[in-house]
């Protein structure tokens, strides 16, 4: 199905289901600003979107001017997005309400699962503008040009967005990001990042936690944020877009202090930067009181066997209906509100990790696009 404009939907308890990612394909033909994607309106609730493939003709996010997300808007209460494949957009999903009348309608209880979010020019999935109690799980996030998964407790101009709370990223594979981090946490409270495999994020940190962007940041984080039981493999860089080191895990304070964050039981393997945990402020091996580090395994000589992905295709990849996206600019600008190439199939869904040396002493320095 070809679309030459955005599809706008505002409804309650609406189910949109294709015949599967191999059979139902939505192709957005415009390469213009606001030229495509599905936008869910202010009063939507109980949406279910599933079993389809989406792509577009967008080729650039230059000057943050595309405004061309595959899925965006607010999905109200208890919506589900599952078994979809999204690629070649500005962003895979950008969830948040930008109402300027003071009548915010937050996305609450959204579940995204069994999704493939790949080869987009910016974020894979971003929970913004008060999104709460929402989860991304059991999904594959690959080859995106900004944070693979992000929680940004933003307050867009003219809105009164509340702090984000209780969002979760669970048991996902985030890989081959070529800008920013595998997972980014930019404020809010009560979030959980657990069970994720983050690998080959060569231009930034595996996980970054920072106050670079305006918003609620961490001042309201009374319930705590937990980052635990993740594996971060071959990630980090000694030379990001700002000529800075980014470790497997990176902390950066710019607009306030990072508060009440626990980081524990993570495996940080074959990191591409030293130190493995970076920061731009004073923090000891066990943290600084507000950031608490414990039982994290650092091993730069780990033996890795096999390939891992959250989703293993059972058929050949669908032939792209447009040329692979190309990035015309890599200049860093604030996250916009509101790619790569043809996918490669996974060879296996199992991996054996054996550490040849283990240290539980994390060391220590993050941004966006």
Model-derived features: positions:
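Leucine-rich solenoid repeat scaffolds
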Residues: 280-314
């Amino acid at each position: 199905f070809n679309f030459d404009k955005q599809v706008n939907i505002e409804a309650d308890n609406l189910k949109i289901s294709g015949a599967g990612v191999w059979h139902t394909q939505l192709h957005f033909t415009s390469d213009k600003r606001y030229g495509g994607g599905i936008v869910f309106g202010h009063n939507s609730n109980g949406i279910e979107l599933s079993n389809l493939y989406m792509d577009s003709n967008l080729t650039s996010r230059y000057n943050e001017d595309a405004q061309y997300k595959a899925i965006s808007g607010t999905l109200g209460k208890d919506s589900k997005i599952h078994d979809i494949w999204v690629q070649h957009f500005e962003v895979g999903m950008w969830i948040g309400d930008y109402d300027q009348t003071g009548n915010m309608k937050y996305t609450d209880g959204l579940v995204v699962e069994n999704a493939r979010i790949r080869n987009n020019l910016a974020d894979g999935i971003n929970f913004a503008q008060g999104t709460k109690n929402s989860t991304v799980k059991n999904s594959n996030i690959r080859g995106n040009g900004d944070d693979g998964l992000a929680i940004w407790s933003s307050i867009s101009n003219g809105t009164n967005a509340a702090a984000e709370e209780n969002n979760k990223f669970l048991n996902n594979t985030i890989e081959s990001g070529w800008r920013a981090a595998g997972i980014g946490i930019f404020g809010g409270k009560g979030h959980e990042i657990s069970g994720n495999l983050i690998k080959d994020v060569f231009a930034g940190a595996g996980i970054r936690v920072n106050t670079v962007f305006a918003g609620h940041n961490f001042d309201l984080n009374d319930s705590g944020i937990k980052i635990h039981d993740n594996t971060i493999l071959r990630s980090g860089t000694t030379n990001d877009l700002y000529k800075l080191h980014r470790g497997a895990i990176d902390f950066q304070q710019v607009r306030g202090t990072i508060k009440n964050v626990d980081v524990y039981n993570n495996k940080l393997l074959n990191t591409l930067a030293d130190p493995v945990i970076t920061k731009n402020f004073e923090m000891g091996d066990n943290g600084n009181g507000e950031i608490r580090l414990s039982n994290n395994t650092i091993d730069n000589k780990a033996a890795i066997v096999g390939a891992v992905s959250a989703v293993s295709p059972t058929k050949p990849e669908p032939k792209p209906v447009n040329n692979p996206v190309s990035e015309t600019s890599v200049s860093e600008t604030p996250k916009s509100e509101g790619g790569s190439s043809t996918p490669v199939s996974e060879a296996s869904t199992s991996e054996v990790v054996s550490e040849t040396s283990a240290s539980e002493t994390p060391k220590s320095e993050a941004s966006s696009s």
